[in-house]
Swiss-Prot record:
It comes from Macaca fascicularis. Liver. The gene is CYP1A2. This is Cytochrome P450 1A2. GO terms for molecular function: estrogen 16-alpha-hydroxylase activity; estrogen 2-hydroxylase activity; heme binding; hydroperoxy icosatetraenoate dehydratase activity; iron ion binding; steroid 17-alpha-monooxygenase activity. Its EC number is 1.14.14.1, 4.2.1.152. It holds the Pfam family p450. PANTHER family: CYTOCHROME P450 1A (PTHR24289:SF21), STEROID 17-ALPHA-HYDROXYLASE/17,20 LYASE (PTHR24289). Interacts with PGRMC1; the interaction requires PGRMC1 homodimerization. A cytochrome P450 monooxygenase involved in the metabolism of various endogenous substrates, including fatty acids, steroid hormones and vitamins. Mechanistically, uses molecular oxygen inserting one oxygen atom into a substrate, and reducing the second into a water molecule, with two electrons provided by NADPH via cytochrome P450 reductase (NADPH--hemoprotein reductase). Catalyzes the hydroxylation of carbon-hydrogen bonds. Exhibits high catalytic activity for the formation of hydroxyestrogens from estrone (E1) and 17beta-estradiol (E2), namely 2-hydroxy E1 and E2. It catalyses: an organic molecule + reduced [NADPH--hemoprotein reductase] + O2 = an alcohol + oxidized [NADPH--hemoprotein reductase] + H2O + H(+); 17beta-estradiol + reduced [NADPH--hemoprotein reductase] + O2 = 2-hydroxy-17beta-estradiol + oxidized [NADPH--hemoprotein reductase] + H2O + H(+); 17beta-estradiol + reduced [NADPH--hemoprotein reductase] + O2 = 4-hydroxy-17beta-estradiol + oxidized [NADPH--hemoprotein reductase] + H2O + H(+); estrone + reduced [NADPH--hemoprotein reductase] + O2 = 2-hydroxyestrone + oxidized [NADPH--hemoprotein reductase] + H2O + H(+). InterPro entries: Cyt_P450, Cyt_P450_CS, Cyt_P450_E_grp-I, Cyt_P450_E_grp-I_CYP1, Cyt_P450_sf. Keywords: Endoplasmic reticulum, Fatty acid metabolism, Glycoprotein, Heme, Iron, Lipid metabolism, Lyase, Membrane, Metal-binding, Microsome, Monooxygenase, Oxidoreductase, Steroid metabolism, Sterol metabolism. Its cofactor is heme. It is found in: Endoplasmic reticulum membrane; Microsome membrane.
C-alpha cells in the first residue's frame, strides 16, 4: 500500500523535473541568435544550465580562457549565466576585430558595475560610442598629450612629464632613504603609488592638486577596491540576484567610486574659482577653456558638469596602470639581481653619475627598455581589456557575431602565446633586442598587448611607457633594490582589472650615489 502511494508521488517529481528541464532548454535555445545561412556560430564548450561557464572561469579567467582557446580556437563563445560572451584570443584575430573591423567592435556592454563609475558616464566604461563620445575622447587625448608629453616652453625639462617625474622620483628616493634609516624596509607599491598619483595629479590640476593629503593618500592606496570589481567576468554583472545579496567587494567598489568622484568634484570646483583662460597650466584648465567654445551640435562643447567625468578617465589612465607597472618592475628586479646590475651598468655607461636620466636618453638605453617590455609581457598585469561589445551584426574568421554581443579580449593569452614567443614562461629581456643588442626589435615589441588596440586603445599609452621608463631610470641610477636573504618574493598575480602582486614589506634600497 505504501509503495503504491509513493509511485504517483515519484512520477509527479519526475514530470516536474522534466518540465523544468524542457523550459530551461527552450529558454536557452530561444536566446541564441538566428545564424544567417552560410555562416556558423563560434564554438561553445558545454556549460551548466543557468550557470553557464562561470565555474570553469574560476579565480583566474585569463588562464581558463587561454586553455579553452587551445581547444576551440581564437574565436569561441562562453556563457556567464545566460549571457553569451565572445572570447577573442590570438594577436591576428584581435587585430582583425579591433583594428580592421574597429567600428564593429568599438562598443561597451552595459554592465551593472560600470554604472557606478562616474555615475555611469565614464568615457572609458560607458556603452556610448557615438560621435559625441568620439569627440570627447579626442579632446581628452589632446589635453593629456599637451600637458604630459608635449614640450614645456617654460621649463628646462623636455616636457611636463619629465619635469614632474624627475621631481617625484627624487622625492621618492629621499623617502626610501628615510624608511631605510628608520624601519629598515618598505612596501614598494605603497611608496610608488603615491609618487605616480602626484605626477598625474600635477598634470591634471597643477598647483590645485592636494598632494599627499589624507584623502588623496587613502584613495590611491585603496585603488584595489576598484580594480577587483571592474574586472572582466565579475559575476555581479551577469547574475542580477547577486546585487541584492551581501557582497562586501561590491560595497567597497561603490564606496570607492563615490569617494573618488567627490574628491575630483571638489578639486575641479576649487580649480574653477581662479581659472584664467589666458593662462592655462594643466589638463583641467584646458577642459575649462574648451567648455567655453565650440558648436554644441558637433559634440565639441563640454558642459561644465561633464568635465569631472573626463578628468576621472584621464586620472585613471595615468595612474593605476603606471603604478602597477613600476611595482611589478621592482619585484622582478629583486628576484633577478643580475638583470638589475646589467641595467645599472648601462645607465652608468650612457649617463654616468653627473646628471639624471632624461626622456631623450631612451634610445640609448635599449636594455632598460627591453626589461620594461618583458615586464609588460611576462606579468601581463592587464589580462583583459575593458570588455567590448559589437555595435552591429558582423562576422569574424567566418563566424557570425550578433549585435550587442559582449566581447572579452584576452591580452594575457597573446603575451604568453608560444607561437609568438617560443618560451613565454621565461623572463628574458634579451628577446626584445636586435642581434647586435643595441636597439629594440620594434616589430616584436609591437606584439605585446597591454593597452588594448583600435578605437578603444588606452589614451594614456604613450604617457605610461614614458613615465615607467623615466621613473625606473632615475631610481635605478641612484638605488640598488633587494630583499633580505631567505625572504620569498611572490610573483603570483592577483586577478583584477589590473593584476597586482602579493604585497612585499621587506624591500630594501641601498644608495649607490646621490646627484645634487
Amino acid at each position: 500500500m505504501a509503495l503504491s502511494q509513493s509511485v504517483p508521488f515519484l512520477a509527479t517529481e519526475l514530470l516536474l523535473a522534466s518540465a523544468i528541464f524542457c523550459l530551461v532548454f527552450w529558454v536557452l535555445r530561444g536566446s541564441r541568435p538566428r545564424v544567417p545561412k552560410g555562416l556558423k556560430s563560434p564554438p561553445e564548450p558545454w556549460g551548466w544550465p543557468l550557470l553557464g561557464h562561470v565555474l570553469t572561469l574560476g579565480k583566474n579567467p585569463h588562464l581558463a580562457l587561454s586553455r579553452m582557446s587551445q581547444l576551440y580556437g581564437d574565436v569561441l563563445q562562453i556563457r556567464i549565466g545566460s549571457t553569451p560572451v565572445l572570447v577573442l584570443s590570438g594577436l591576428d584575430t584581435i587585430r582583425q576585430a579591433l583594428v580592421r573591423q574597429g567600428d564593429d567592435f568599438k562598443g561597451r556592454p552595459d554592465l551593472y558595475s560600470f554604472t557606478f563609475i562616474t555615475d555611469g558616464q565614464s568615457m572609458s566604461f560607458s556603452p556610448d560610442s557615438g560621435p559625441v563620445w568620439a569627440a570627447r575622447r579626442r579632446l581628452a587625448q589632446n589635453a593629456l598629450n599637451t600637458f604630459s608629453i608635449a614640450s614645456d616652453p617654460a621649463s628646462s625639462s623636455s616636457c611636463y612629464l619629465e619635469e614632474h617625474v624627475s621631481k617625484e622620483a627624487e622625492a621618492l628616493i629621499s623617502r626610501l632613504q628615510e624608511l631605510m634609516a628608520g624601519p629598515g624596509h618598505f612596501d614598494p607599491y605603497n611608496q610608488v603609488v603615491v609618487s605616480v598619483a602626484n605626477v598625474i595629479g600635477a598634470m591634471c590640476f597643477g598647483q590645485h592638486f592636494p598632494e599627499s593629503s589624507d584623502e588623496m593618500l587613502s584613495l590611491v592606496k585603496n585603488s584595489h577596491e576598484f580594480v577587483e570589481s571592474a574586472s572582466s567576468g565579475n559575476p555581479v554583472d551577469f547574475f542580477p540576484i547577486l546585487r541584492y545579496l551581501p557582497n562586501p567587494a561590491l560595497q567597497r567598489f561603490k564606496a570607492f567610486n563615490q569617494r573618488f568622484r567627490r574628491f575630483l568634484q571638489k578639486t575641479v570646483q576649487e580649480h574653477y574659482q581662479d581659472f584664467d583662460k589666458n593662462s592655462v597650466q594643466d589638463i583641467t584648465g584646458a577642459l575649462f577653456k574648451h567648455s567655453k567654445k565650440g558648436p554644441r551640435a558637433s559634440g565639441n562643447l563640454i558642459p561644465q558638469e561633464k568635465i569631472v567625468n573626463l578628468v576621472n578617465d584621464i586620472f585613471g589612465a595615468g595612474f593605476d596602470t603606471i603604478a602597477t607597472a613600476i611595482s611589478w618592475s621592482l619585484m622582478y628586479l629583486v628576484t633577478k639581481p643580475e638583470i638589475q646590475r646589467k641595467i645599472q651598468k648601462e645607465l652608468d655607461a650612457v649617463i654616468g653619475r653627473g646628471r639624471r636620466p632624461r626622456l631623450s636618453d631612451r634610445p640609448q638605453l635599449p636594455y632598460l627598455e627591453a626589461f620594461i617590455l618583458e615586464t609588460f609581457r611576462h606579468s601581463s598585469f592587464v589580462p583583459f581589456t575593458i570588455p567590448h561589445s559589437t555595435t552591429r551584426d558582423t562576422t569574424l574568421n567566418g563566424f557570425y557575431i550578433p549585435r550587442e554581443c559582449c566581447v572579452f579580449i584576452n591580452q594575457w593569452q597573446v603575451n604568453h602565446d608560444p607561437q609568438l614567443w617560443g618560451d613565454p614562461s621565461e623572463f628574458r629581456p634579451e628577446r626584445f633586442l636586435t642581434a647586435e643588442g643595441t636597439t629594440i626589435n620594434k616589430p616584436l615589441s609591437e606584439k605585446i598587448m597591454l593597452f588594448g588596440l583600435g578605437k578603444r586603445r588606452c589614451i594614456g599609452e604613450v604617457l605610461g611607457k614614458w613615465e615607467v621608463f623615466l621613473f625606473l631610470a632615475i631610481l635605478l641610477q641612484q638605488l640598488e633594490f633587494s630583499v633580505p636573504p631567505g625572504v620569498k618574493v611572490d610573483l603570483t598575480p592577483i586577478y583584477g582589472l589590473t593584476m597586482k602582486h602579493a604585497r612585499c614589506e621587506h624591500f630594501q634600497a641601498r644608495l649607490r650615489f646621490s646627484i645634487k
